[in-house]
Amino acid sequence: MKIEPIIENIKEVILKHVPARYIFLFGSYAYGNPTEESDIDIYIVTPDDTGNFSELCAKIRGDLSKKKIFFVDLLLTRESVFEVRKMKNVLDRTVYQKGKIIYEY
């Protein structure tokens, strides 16, 4: 499966709803070892004043489903939290060190 056009669609949908600072692709697609059962893992870093993450995820997922893009895991975090956690938390550090930046503001 060609992942690049799907990633572009995901990025467009996210940016429609979220003023992202960074959007990372992580997991098997970023690391080059996806399987047929792999989902697309996306990590979004937002400004600190970004609204309700649950509502934003619901809007993003709704738009993705209209584009027939279903297998996406979304994680959102605020920029100040990411700056602290990227050196301490295992997931955040892995995303920062090994993830692929697909958008940067």
What does each of the following model-derived ranges do?
Residues 41-45:
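Short beta-strand->loop micro-motif that forms the acidic, two-metal-ion catalytic signature
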